[in-house]
Amino acid sequence: MIIIVYLFILIMISLLVYLCTLNTIFCVIIIILTIIFLILLLMSHVKFEINRFDIVRYKIDKNIKIMLMSDMHNREISDRIVKAISEEEPDYIIMSGDMINESIKDTENFIKLLDRIDSDKIYYTFGNHEDELSETDKEEYYKILKKYKINLLNNKSVKLSNNIILSGFDIPYDFYKFMGKKITKKDMSEYLNKCEIDKYNILVAHNPLWNEYYKEFNYDLCLSGHVHGGMVRFPFIGGIFSPDYKFFPKYTKGKYKVGDMTSIVSSGLGYSKRIKMRILNPGEVVIINLLKK
């Protein structure tokens, strides 16, 4: 799929070059538009957003401020994250996966971040890149997380208050679409924790493209990433492409209603080694205020 995207871009560039040879005015317009595009592209890599959502529910018994971050992919972006944490002062920092790439050698910038923040506030669920680590690398990575006292949430639950339950969902790498193994509701039930209906249940699950499954397990709120905002974003259209090699993914960035469940998807902070692309799509962290009604 990504080859098709690049091929399409190459064809369009070739067409524009040909048209420029036919019309000088058209050529000037194309040059101006290209400069604007390059400026916007640069801003996508430099700019950093903080987006906010308030959630007010009867089942929430305590006001809690959460910072959601996802898909750092070991990018050197620590200064901006540390500044955001200092300014926002969240009660909890939730990391919904792919904070590193698929090798223990590709973790240094994430470790630098952990050196600079209050890591015992962090609740972390793995994404496909952590799950792709070799067994040896994964053992080493567990040691790093233990050293920094990270709360690893993979298929576990914790109480944030008397009535707010936070659960993590991690599933074997084989189930990601690019590996070809189709997931079922039965598969989900083996990994998802059971919800207490009278509690406010939050799920941290890397991949929002499975939202239709998550909602069947009575979660009130799902926090995700994975899709990188659709990589390329256009006004009124949204995200174009997902890491699962799918055009126009349904969930890319922001807040969605999926049945009775609310889904909040972070567009992430970086880009993977496989597809180094963010266009009109700056990195972000998300602030979620859980408020008593």
Positions of the model-derived regions?
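Non-catalytic terminal accessory segments
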Residues: 1-49
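Alpha-helical transmembrane signal-anchor/signal-peptide segments
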Residues: 47-59
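Beta-strand-turn-beta hairpins that frame and shape the catalytic cleft
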Residues: 56-67, 150, 157-168, 197, ...
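Membrane-embedded segments
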Residues: 62-153
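Active-site metal-binding loops of divalent metal-dependent hydrolases
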Residues: 70-74, 97-99, 128-130, 156-157, ...
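Short, Asp-centered acidic motifs that coordinate Mg2+ and/or phosphate
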Residues: 91-92, 123, 150-151, 164, ...
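Binuclear metal-dependent hydrolase catalytic cores centered on His/Asp/Glu-rich metal-binding motifs
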Residues: 139, 143-148, 161-201, 211-212, ...
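Conserved beta-sheet core of the metallophosphoesterase superfamily
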Residues: 207-286
